[in-house]
Regions:
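Extended alpha-helical targeting/anchoring segments
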Residues: 1-529
Length: 529
């Protein structure tokens, strides 16, 4: 299809690609290309046991930014290329959604969820997910490429309240919108197994397609040149602030009171398990430098750095939120519950004998096992909601994964996605992951809001991507920091069951937060010295 024809046919995307020099250090490339640039995203994956890098996806330029708050989605065109996509929203928005033109974008308003509908009807009703779904469904690629249409970003924990009735609570310091996603215009895909780098540009059809094609092609050339001339040391630099003490929004004593209060609801039969949390905070003048330290100190299966105009989110998460692969049609949840500190000597090195004894203690702890099995059952129920009958099963049960400061009990639940659903339906049905809420999910989420008395923001939500093929890969936002106004907010929770020890649960939140706290502090100390 010629550029002239593309100008008359909205809803198409032409992919422009170039092969680049292999980038063994994607963070250095991100720092070089995007250090002070909003609407940029770095997603990195690693093998669980070896911690070897697998793939890095680096979004340099975004065409659109989509922000959801409650039942409204604001779509902002960031480039002329992005403006070409805007007519699709008015053309394809489902019934029950209104589209209003605003400065540089659109405001889409959805009807509130109807509680009288059954679970399946609610899942298929028009919702804020349709703004994302529309882009993956109604933009067709002229040439096959998995990332021709690529949406990367974050779902907040509080998106759940758009679909379930939860107590109203105010914003906390972590005021991440219900979701923020970017539609990629230019990005890098780095495969660490084959040691290849691909530069990808997406040109969307519409009246400005000729100019957009030229602009995107030129941008890829500029990126290629920038990468070829990248300094040998492009590590992010930290700020000059003096390392400060860590503050916490809830003392050990207050958190222990929350645990005891929640245990009364467990004993009353209202819930089986619940995951309260608290927030640690400290100065973070350079979140990118802190992420570099976290990646070095605590490599994890999912590592991410999201740079918005108003905030940054970074983390090294051990836990998948929801994963869906179109080619296999498999939907997957990877529940993690049950935690112990690593066995370390006084100098911080791993004592392998002590470490193995701690693992045995974890595996034989009835409280930890009961907590984990409850969450596996919850994951089984969630996956069953969206799977073909008879295809859901537990692929792995009660394995142990190790990280820098802690080890975890893990399992894996999979199923074959129903033909009438997609990855966004699956995420909606499963959010939020039970390991961050409890069971039953809505009752536990209600009690979480009662004790925490504020929205969680990004913590306990998910970061990842959806592409035009229909694939989704997301991780839970844990072992993470939300950074705003040079302050990092690091939230961590603990699973509470009927025989939980309140002090142990308080200590667990500290253990879980420690890797991120250490990374922020180390980044500051390196600058100071």
């Amino acid at each position: 299809m010629s550029l002239a024809e593309l100008g008359e046919h909205p809803g198409k995307v032409e992919t422009v690609t170039q092969q680049g020099t292999y980038l063994a250090d994607p963070l250095a490339a991100f720092t070089h290309l995007c250090q002070n640039k909003p609407n940029a995203l770095l997603l990195e994956s690693a093998e669980i046991d070896s911690k070897d890098d697998l793939q890095s996806l680096l979004m340099v330029d975004a065409a659109l930014r989509l922000e959801c708050r409650g039942n409204q989605v604001t779509v902002s065109a960031l480039t002329a290329n992005g403006r070409s996509v805007m007519p699709l929203f008015a053309e394809h928005c489902p019934a029950g959604m209104s589209v209003e033109t605003i400065t540089d974008g659109l405001r889409i308003t959805c009807q509130p969820a109807d509680p009288s509908l059954d679970e399946d009807a609610r899942l298929k009703a028009a919702s804020v997910f349709d703004a994302l779904r529309l882009l993956t469904k109604h933009i067709s690629a002229l040439r096959s490429h998995p990332h021709a249409v690529f949406l990367g970003g974050a779902f907040a924990y509080d998106l759940l309240a758009t679909f379930e009735h939860l107590p109203d609570v105010p914003e906390g310091q972590n005021d991440c919108p219900d979701y923020v996603f970017y539609l990629a215009e230019t990005m890098l895909a780095i495969d660490h197994q084959t040691q290849t780098t691909e530069l990808i540009g997406s040109v969307f059809s519409g009246p400005e397609v000729a100019n957009s094609y030229f602009a995107v092609s030129q941008r890829l050339e500029h990126l290629q040149q920038a990468l070829n001339s990248m300094p040998t040391n492009s590590a992010p630099t930290a700020g000059s602030a003096t390392p400060a003490d860590v503050s916490v929004d809830k003392s050990d004593e207050a958190f222990m009171q929350d645990v005891n209060y929640l245990k009364t609801h467990i004993l009353a039969g209202d819930i089986f398990q619940v995951v309260p949390s608290r927030t640690f905070s400290l100065p973070c003048p350079s979140p990118l430098a802190a992420y570099a330290q976290l990646k070095k100190q605590n490599p994890s299966p999912y590592m991410f750095y999201m740079q918005d105009a108003d905030f940054s989110i970074f983390g090294a998460s051990p836990e998948s939120a929801l994963k869906y692969e179109k080619h296999s049609n498999q939907v997957e949840i990877y529940p993690i519950a049950g935690t112990r500190p690593r066995g370390k000597r006084a100098d911080g090195t791993i004592d392998h004998d002590l470490d193995s004894r701690i693992e045995l203690d974890l595996r034989e702890d009835n409280k930890e096992k009961s907590e984990h099995i409850m969450l596996v059952d919850l994951a089984r129920n969630d996956v069953a909601k969206v799977s073909r009958p008879g295809t859901r099963y537990v692929k792995d049960l009660l394995k142990v994964d190790r990280y820098s400061h802690v080890m975890h009990l893990v399992s894996r639940v999979v199923g074959q996605l129903r033909d009438d659903l997609d990855a966004l339906h699956a995420y909606q049905a499963c959010m939020n992951m039970g390991t961050l809420v409890g069971a039953p999910k809505v009752s536990a989420a209600t009690l979480v809001r009662q004790v925490e008395q504020q929205r969680r923001g990004s913590y306990g939500g998910a970061v990842g991507y959806i592409n035009g093929n229909g694939d989704m890969d997301t991780c839970i936002v844990i072992r993470s920091a939300f950074v705003k106004n040079q302050t990092a907010y690091i939230q961590a929770g603990a699973g509470v069951v009927y025989d939980s020890d309140p002090l142990s649960e308080a200590n667990e939140t500290r253990s879980k937060a420690q890797a991120v706290i250490s990374a922020v502090q180390t980044a500051m100390q390196k600058e100071q010295y």
